Design a protein with these regions (language model features):
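N-terminal secretory signal peptides that target proteins for export/translocation
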Residues: 1-2
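Sec-dependent N-terminal signal peptides
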Residues: 5-17
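A generic "folded-domain core" signal
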Residues: 21-130
Length: 130
């Protein structure tokens, strides 16, 4: 009987590990950023994410906002900037602001992406300066 229980537990552990094989895996943290890798079946995806340090007003109730910078080597995508604000966007166009710089984004559901690759490069440059 004990042997049967051990075998069932080992099989369960195998399937649990297999089911979680494609979950994003944290690679490390640097200041307010955390980096992850993930395999979507087409290839490895690497991304960094950060969450706001401060939220206003204090009683703000919604899922946390996140800013992502993603690399998809198999699709030749690098420095793809996206954001989720924890809610569905009401409009299809979104504006991200950093200092005096404004960046146009398009949204789908609760995510938004920069429209223009040149703006992505400019936003990455702005973020590196900050």
């Amino acid at each position: 009987m004990m042997k049967k229980i051990i075998i069932i537990n080992l099989i369960s552990l195998f399937f649990l590990n297999f089911a979680n094989a494609n979950d994003p895996k944290s690679v490390g943290k640097f200041k307010n950023w955390e980096t992850f890798t993930y395999d979507d079946g087409k290839g490895k995806i690497c991304f960094a994410q950060t969450i706001p340090i401060e939220r206003s007003p204090n009683n703000f109730v919604r899922k946390p906002s996140r800013l992502f910078v993603t690399f998809r080597k198999s699709e030749k995508i690098r420095d793809e900037v996206s954001v989720t604000s924890g809610h569905e966007y009401k409009s299809s166009s979104v504006t991200a602001t950093s200092g005096k710089n404004e960046f146009s984004m398009f949204s789908q559901g609760n995510f938004a992406w920069l429209i223009d690759r040149e703006e992505e490069a400019s936003l990455i440059k702005t973020m590196k300066k900050a």
